[in-house]
Amino acid sequence: MFRTTDGGKSWKPIFKTGYEYDYSKAPYTKVAPLHWMFDIEIDPTDAEHAMFTTGFGGWETFNLSAVEREEPVKWSIMSAGIEETVPLELYAPEKGARLISGIGDYGGFTHFDLNRPDSLGSHANPHFGNTNGVTGAWLKQDLVVRVGTLFGHQPDAKTISYSEDGGRHWTMCATVPTEKSRNGHIAVAADGSSWIWIPDRSKAYLTRDKGASWQVCRGLPKNIRVIADKVNPKRFYAVDAVAEILYSSEDGGATFHADTLNLTVKRSQRGNAGAAVRRGDLRGGQDRIYATPGREKDLWIAAYDGLYHSVTSEKFDFRVLDKVRTIYAFGFGKAKPGNDYPAIYLIGVINGQYGFFRSDDAANSWVRINDDVHQYGLVLHICGDMQEYGRVYICLLYTSPSPRDISGS
């Protein structure tokens, strides 16, 4: 970037004499303030005032003439609370941070206060571009693990990192399963003793030493999403909702066994390459299995075209919930005061009506928590706050995770 004051006869580089950045309004921009510059404008009424755009937002200065004195130009971020993002994953712990997010381009954040910028900035060591998976050990809440793709050039950095203080500080794993391992999904045993990572288009890999070594999980197909039981650290689960197959492990993820399910998903969509597109957005929360916080082997399958629940201890006997017709996103939240079962949140069609819904009685009844004016476009995920009943977070395409307080609904 150059500046001229004589009609283009001579030019002075703006950044060669030094510069200062004020990141205070958006600390996450510190990782890469200058990139994707598309435009610069000088205030026609004030030659000291200029602005330029980047992929992380707009920057502004009021001392542009410092270049002439060979002094630093000070730039301040303009994007206070406004940013185009794609949230890819949400994790709400029972203690500590209210929410830990995985986001496209910016990596992700540990949110202690959703009303203010995260003072820690985006997750570091390493910085991810995309964080496709983030979760934690339910019985060891300080342990959180994330997987994604690296941001920029970070020699020797790994695409998996973990925190042992609830997302404040991060440690890179020593190794990855293969040279190309990145993105995908991560599952962490309830006590944190074992992790299962399924990188993009890859087999599932198990580590029991925080990524120092890896082994292939036996009995799983490639590219399938695995979750951990929230109580028993030996149990992991995965589901292929369209093929009606449940995979389960009782040895900490080393071996999985397949069980045939009797679901009622639309058979016309099976075996068709285009079916995945018609079954909602692949980045969304449908056609997944979920484990209920605080309850062993209490499982939900949020299929695109139906909701199924199993609490049978001896076998996996899923029953369909007859009111739910379509699901785009599904999640849990803190139980209503006086209840012992977590609140359930769902985005989809119930009783013929599209909306955002909450159930306080294990999906026997539902309350709509939005209205026709507040639909928000494409919503990929929904996640209840596990520390405050009635607060819920939704992932909107091209926005940050959006909190909504709906306890009075």
Where are these regions (language model features)?
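Beta-propeller fold detector
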Residues: 12-18, 70-77, 120-122, 171-175, ...
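Surface-exposed loop and turn segments in beta-propeller and other repeat-based domains
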Residues: 15-31, 261-279
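Conserved blade-ending motifs and adjacent loop-strand segments that build the rim/top face
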Residues: 79-87, 128-129, 322-331, 366-384
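Short glycine/acidic-enriched loop and turn motifs that connect beta-strands
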Residues: 58-59, 107, 150-154, 243-245, ...
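Signature of short aromatic-glycine-proline-rich micro-motifs recurring in repeat-based ectodomains
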Residues: 27-41, 87, 130-133, 276-289, ...
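Conserved Ser/Thr-centered positions that define the repeating blades of beta-propeller domains
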Residues: 4-5, 61, 108-111, 162-164, ...
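Loop/turn-rich, solvent-exposed surfaces of beta-rich toroidal or solenoidal domains
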Residues: 36-45, 294-295, 302-304, 321-360
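Conserved small/polar residues in nucleotide/adenosyl-binding loops
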Residues: 398-405
